[in-house]
Amino acid sequence: MTPCRRGEGRVADQIAPEGVYSKSGARLLDRTGERRLPVGFDGFETVAARLVFVDKSILVADVLESGQAVTLFCRPRRFGKTLAMTMLKAFFELPPDGVSRVSLFEGLEVWDACDGRYRVEQGVRPVVFFTFNEVKKADWALAYENITVAMSWF
């Protein structure tokens, strides 16, 4: 893919009726108008539909344009890794229930970037999602056992 300029297609500074607030290139979304923060939520579908969040969807474009076979996301605890991964899953995944996830991304930066060129990538790939969120144990032996059990599901 030929990269486009980051920020191309961004909404000008405004408050849009669909709950997209844009200022100086950053987007804050609150589609319900309830101003509820996503404390304790890390699933993108829930957060995007019901809570306030910062639009980091351009990560999709970054992944597509990187050309890398593998991308490692390293961040400290509580920095939104799982939210970012569930966003990527929701964007790329062939919906197992057959219900389109397009509405989650309409109005987000990735949807508008580069004249909508990333839209064709939405919902067209099989995705394997694995998280270590539930593998928190006091010692290595218990953690290893939980990892083995979680991976045996695949």
What is each of the regions a protein language model found here?
Residues 9-10, 119:
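Residue-level detector of alpha-helical transmembrane segments in integral membrane proteins
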